[in-house]
Amino acid sequence: MAIVPGLKGRGVSGCNDIMRGEETQLLGILDWLKSKATEQDVFCCMPGTHCKWVRIEQGTINQFSTTFSGELFANINRDSSLVRGLPSSDHIDTEAFKLGLETSQKQGGLLPHLFSARSN
């Protein structure tokens, strides 16, 4: 087996996308699928600064999409007007989290919905 670093493709949004090393982490899943002798399709979440969602079909990485979610969360949580003046806490308000999930699925785009957190 030889590992050729990096993958390039189009994500679900149609935008160009790349993997630079994360594909090696998927070797374990591909090996596990092979050991199970399954043709099961798998959808993997690879959380991190740049979260990757990967579709594996018939033992092959078919498509992946990278999101800016981890880095965006870190920057908003550290430097934005959304958190300025609020006390720091590791507590997760599950109701607020659920509301955020519901809001994220509404029309209008991410940025207006983020700003609406200030007015709620």
Q: Which role does the model predict for each range below?
A:
Residues 3-38, 47-103, 107:
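Glycine-rich phosphate-binding loop plus the immediately following alpha-helix
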Residues 103-120:
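Adenine-nucleotide phosphate-binding core of ATP-dependent small-molecule kinases
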Residues 43-45:
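Conserved beta-strand elements of the Class I
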